[in-house]
Amino acid sequence: MYTLGIDVGSASSKAVILKDGKDIVAAEVVQVGTGSSGPQRALDKAFEVSGLKKEDISYTVATGYGRFNFSDADKQISEISCHAKGIYFLVPTARTIIDIGGQDAKAIRLDDKGGIKQFFMNDKCAAGTGRFLEVMARVLETTLDEMAELDEQATDTAPISSTCTVFAESEVISQLSNGVSRNNIIKGVHLSVASRACGLAYRGGLEKDVVMTGGVAKNAGVVRAVAGVLKTDVIVAPNPQTTGALGAALYAYEAAQKK
């Protein structure tokens, strides 16, 4: 039996195809979000990789901001539930999930059975999200991929005191004009993102193991900063952008069994 999970996010769409509720046969990401083409492109890539067709899918669950825009889904489930489901499948010891996506950040507390105990979310401001990093990369004339490497070369941390993206952008420009090292500024940017995410995690009381997911988890500089703020090891989920879609595919498998 094949089931499908689609995660329609603000910056990207993800598709995961699961076989018999346990084997991942495709996990694809396209950098197009809630627009109509994003989910379909992710789905097309998943079908291409797996060699499957639409008719092979027994059940489909959509999640993410744009989940109601994907008309082929049998069911829609919140991204909080799907991230929890996906992470518990991958890392059963997870008790705290830190998810930093394109437009929001979340902290989710799990019990020992993978149930959600608490969750906290920042979706009111771009600061502390992938969007914040994109803005800073543009100002610093670098790429998101290069930022983690430049962070490693930093000799100090140039703190970013502003919690608003617009003011933080001005602060970074001022630091550059004052001759502050770009690498040190990048380290400060990563610390700023990490601090906001860790603030959410601390609100519920931190429990180990801590697992990071979302696109920003691919940035080793942010992961190091999160570990430093929390003073604990941080596990990066395998293929961290697709954990929500994986959770959706797992929910789809459960639903298909009840049909």
Curated annotation (Swiss-Prot):
- Keyword line: 4Fe-4S, Iron, Iron-sulfur, Metal-binding
Q: Name one GO molecular function term.
A: lactoyl-CoA dehydratase activity
List positions binding [4Fe-4S] cluster.
125, 164
**Cofactor(s) required, per the database record:** [4Fe-4S] cluster
Cofactor stoichiometry and binding?
A: Binds 1 [4Fe-4S] cluster per dimer.
- Annotated coiled-coil segments of the chain: none
InterPro entries documented for this protein: ATPase_BadF, ATPase_NBD, CoA_E_activase_dom, Dehydratase_Activator_Redct
Transmembrane intervals: none
| Iron-sulfur listed as a keyword | yes
Any Pfam family: BcrAD_BadFG
Question: Is Ribonucleoprotein among the key words of this record?
Answer: no
Q: Tell me, in a sentence or two, what this protein's role is.
A: Required for the activation of lactoyl-CoA dehydratase. This protein is extremely sensitive towards oxygen.
Self-association state and partner proteins as the record states:
Homodimer.
User: What protein is this chain from?
Assistant: Activator of lactoyl-CoA dehydratase
Name the source organism.
Answer: Anaerotignum propionicum (Clostridium propionicum)
